[in-house]
């Protein structure tokens, strides 16, 4: 492992080539000599094991990251492999060197409160992601060829996006009166029978995890719609999982979304409780019927393959995103207006000209 200031690049113990995480085998591979290593072997060869390391007292985010501040909220770093200068924004934690193409992990940005607790590693590699993209785009019509030409496809990137996870215990209870109403018709008469019952329900459940994207930036839309992620696959965070991928750091705090999350949890519990009371009428639920306790927050990185496209002559951004765990695909595609117009003219000609010819002979 090469480490300069707070930049890390994982290197092959056999040949010194760059190591990247391989989703297909869940280990680390060298593109130069073909060696493969498990996480345990990588830690042993590097002679270091990660632990949570808080920021020194009084150290700012930029100082902890080990970079030099530049104009426009960009930070400059030196690549630990070749020394090239790399510019990133303040929330990027893993990127690529434009010169030697090795992954550079900005470890100084992953200290203290900015260090993730968990990561869901990529389960889909680039080859499979490209295959899924090709199948998906093949089902779409009138998409400009420039959206899926070789140059554009090469921009497909594996990105770890930051998420805040909320877990809690929920108690839902009700002790009230409920009515069952039955109606019987006999001729022109209708008999209505109302039975009143005392209804009691009481139960607890643990909400596994409510996930929220923890980015304020515009590119949060790339990660929103590909949810859900299976949080059962969460692993304790290790920076080596970032090798070969890009990563973003959270810039939203739990305090900024706690109200929204608690409302969602209460709505979830209320829907579960109402489903148990559907046979009764006249029961209304309030906040007192649902108690939320033992709430806790954690911070995780989730895998997304994503590609963006900006249409010529327009500021509109189109995108393709693929859940790097489940393979779920979402996207907003541009339309080739020329191809669409030609298709409409073809349909018009195929339908209108035969009708015109038929009317000539009939009339």
Where are these regions (language model features)?
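Short, non-ligating residues that shape and space the ligands of small metal-coordination modules
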Residues: 21-22, 39-40, 88-89, 106-107
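Juxtamembrane/start-of-transmembrane alpha-helix segments at the extracytoplasmic/lumenal side
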Residues: 333-344
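Cys/His-rich metal-chelating microdomains
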Residues: 16-18, 36, 84-85, 103
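Extended, hydrophilic extramembrane loops/domains of integral membrane proteins
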Residues: 302-333
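Residues immediately within or flanking Cys/His clusters that coordinate Zn2+
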Residues: 7-9, 25-27, 72-76, 94
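Short cysteine-rich clusters marking metal-coordination/redox-active sites
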Residues: 12-15, 30-33, 79-82, 97-100
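Charged, low-complexity helical/coil segments in non-catalytic cytosolic or luminal regions
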Residues: 114-314
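Juxtamembrane boundary at the C-terminal end of a transmembrane helix
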Residues: 354-363
